[in-house]
Amino acid sequence: MKGSRIELGDVTPHNIKQLKRLNQVIFPVSYNDKFYKDVLEVGELAKLAYFNDIAVGAVCCRVDHSQNQKRLYIMTLGCLAPYRRLGIGTKMLNHVLNICEKDGTFDNIYLHVQISNESAIDFYRKFGFEIIETKKNYYKRIEPADAHVLQKNLKVPSGQNADVQKTDN
């Protein structure tokens, strides 16, 4: 598809219904109104993906402070089936990875993936994510209900925390 354009755009109150519709089609789970209200607050951590000006996918993340770490949680990252394998998911994930890299304070990025979603697991593994645990009955009303937790550890940029050693002079 030479000449096709993939662009990321902001999620706004004017296009939140597009995001809602995409998520209904892409994911086997439904998201409540609080999810969409929160998405409007995260700025660059939520993006719609456009293929030749058509909204075909989205990524939605949040900052999560847990386990004494600053973590980025990918709540959703998905693309309509006819537009998969065109680099759209890669563009969305790279956007998120770049935010974490520029910020420099994230310990890791993580997400949940249904255990049967092999293509998603393979996709994230290409970017250095690893399965760190499996949660039984994570999903309600879908089968299989179990989810893998995939995580990518982020290194602290060199130079940061380098001069922390105390010396007694």
Swiss-Prot record:
At what positions is Phosphothreonine found?
T12
Organism domain of life: Eukaryota
pH-activity dependence text: Optimum pH is 7.5-8.0.
Which SUPFAM superfamilies does the record associate with it? Answer: Acyl-CoA N-acyltransferases (Nat)
Residues bound to acetyl-CoA: L77, G78, C79, L80, A81, P82, Y83, R84, R85, L86, G87, I88, G89, T90
Give the consequence of mutating R84A: Strongly decreased N-alpha-acetyltransferase activity
One cellular component (GO) term of this entry: extracellular exosome
- Principal localization reads cytoplasm
For the ligand (CoA), the binding residues are: N117, E118, S119, A120, I121, D122, F123, Y124, R125, K126
Modification N6-acetyllysine, positions: K34, K37, K140
User: Matching Pfam families, A to Z?
Assistant: Acetyltransf_1 (PF00583)
Broad enzyme group: transferase
Active-site residues (renumbered) = Y73, H112
PROSITE patterns given in the database record: GNAT (PS51186)
Question: What is known to happen upon mutating Y73 to A/F?
Answer: Abolishes N-alpha-acetyltransferase activity
Instruction: Extract one GO molecular function annotation from the record.
Output: histone H4 acetyltransferase activity
Tell me what reaction this enzyme catalyses: N-terminal L-methionyl-L-alanyl-[protein] + acetyl-CoA = N-terminal N(alpha)-acetyl-L-methionyl-L-alanyl-[protein] + CoA + H(+); N-terminal L-methionyl-L-seryl-[protein] + acetyl-CoA = N-terminal N(alpha)-acetyl-L-methionyl-L-seryl-[protein] + CoA + H(+); N-terminal L-methionyl-L-valyl-[protein] + acetyl-CoA = N-terminal N(alpha)-acetyl-L-methionyl-L-valyl-[protein] + CoA + H(+); N-terminal L-methionyl-L-threonyl-[protein] + acetyl-CoA = N-terminal N(alpha)-acetyl-L-methionyl-L-threonyl-[protein] + CoA + H(+)
- Quote the Gene3D superfamilies the UniProt record gives: 3.40.630.30
User: Which key words are in the record?
Assistant: Acetylation, Acyltransferase, Cytoplasm, Nucleus, Phosphoprotein, Transferase
Effect after changing E7A: Restores the acetylation activity of the NatA complex
List S-S links within the chain.
none
Q: Where in the cell is it found?
A: Cytoplasm; Nucleus
Q: Which family does it belong to?
A: Belongs to the acetyltransferase family. GNAT subfamily.
SUBUNIT field: Component of the N-terminal acetyltransferase E (NatE) complex at least composed of NAA10, NAA15 and NAA50. Interacts with NAA10. Interacts with NAA15. Predominantly interacts with NAA15 in the N-terminal acetyltransferase A complex (NatA complex); the interactions reduce the acetylation activity of the NatA complex. Component of the N-terminal acetyltransferase E (NatE)/HYPK complex at least composed of NAA10, NAA15, NAA50 and HYPK. Within the complex interacts with NAA15. Its capacity to interact with the NatA complex is reduced by HYPK. Interacts with NAA35.
**Job of this protein:** N-alpha-acetyltransferase that acetylates the N-terminus of proteins that retain their initiating methionine. Has a broad substrate specificity: able to acetylate the initiator methionine of most peptides, except for those with a proline in second position. Also displays N-epsilon-acetyltransferase activity by mediating acetylation of the side chain of specific lysines on proteins. Autoacetylates in vivo. The relevance of N-epsilon-acetyltransferase activity is however unclear: able to acetylate H4 in vitro, but this result has not been confirmed in vivo.
What name appears for this protein in its UniProt entry? N-alpha-acetyltransferase 50
Origin species, per record, is: Homo sapiens
